[in-house]
Amino acid sequence: MEQKDYTLRNDNGRIIFERYTGTDECFRVPEGVTEIAERAFADNKRLKHIDLGDVISVGAFAFQDCSNLETVLMDKAEVISAGAFEFCSSLHTVSIGAVKTIGDMAFRHCRQLDIAEMPRSLTSIGAGTFSHTAIKTARIDWLEEIPRALFSGDTCLTYADISGARIIGETAFAECRSLSVALFGAAESIGSKAFYKCDSFEPAKLPETLKSIGDEAFEKVREELIVPRSVSCFGKNCFGPSDRRKAVCVYESSLYSFSKYFMEEAPDRFDEDEHFHLWESSIDVTVLDDSDKQTGYLPLFTDLDHQLTEKMIDAFKADNSFDYRFIDAELFPGLRWNRRCMDDIVFKRLKNPYDLEEDARRQYSDYLKSHLMRLAKSAVSNNDID
């Protein structure tokens, strides 16, 4: 009698493929088998081609580290469990036309794998599923959530349509360095480092549905990117590294939330000896009113000790007694004290401050003139001029 090089198990009518011990390069799973057990083919270095026949479910790590496996036919498979084909470094072709669920890291580090089209039957997908693959185009516009690290490290990916997704998980496209187009028009949340080090991707517009942007979500953004009013949560360096200059447009109603992007603690008021510690400027903010009209311009700074508070914004708009401690340091660019004086200011420049009443605008102007004049006289008397 012929000795079989595999083991089957009958579990109440379900035929489960338990373990393969053969050395063939090509193998077809016997008819009637509907499940592949956990690690059934794992670490097989000879297998190159496999036909799963009637299999509906592929167990966890079933083919993990089958480093010479090149093609997999599984037209009836509905469930591919976690790590099923992880580290199959030679795998380039799979047929997944009926799949409904793919588990975490199922195809992670399949560095030659390119799936031309994802089946619309797919309703659930795990974290890191296609991380470090060679997929060039991803169209999964029906999924509402893009899981963590889904395509991270896929340097071949150039186009992604995730236009139905409400949630984009952290590092979902991190280090997809060739990605140039990503459609995410329904997104409400973009996770930390979602597009981190996507050097070719510069979003020109963010969706009106967006509410939060995580830390370091984008590597860079298009000049004058408009930040929607809906966004209330901004992560640290969410528009790119702190050492890279950016320019965005922000609505007045979002300015308080936006300020938290730069600063940690908000003072309730200014004291005479209050100091604000500033470093290199990193972002230019054009302020818009509800009709998209520009009302102000703020070059903001990283590493501020304090942030713009609601009380401060209210004072901008109405309070004539507010002490406008803002200095246009560019008025006297030749004075070396300019750089040192930045410890006393929040913003380098504020043009057309927020619909001030005429008296308040005059007070603001007089304050700037008198304060700068005192500083200039002090600099001259101390011979502190370039």
Predicted regions and their residues:
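Structural signature of tandem-repeat unit edges
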Residues: M1-R14, T21-E35, K45-S57, S67-V79, ...
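Repeat-mediated protein-protein interaction surfaces in helical alpha-solenoids
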Residues: D344-Y364
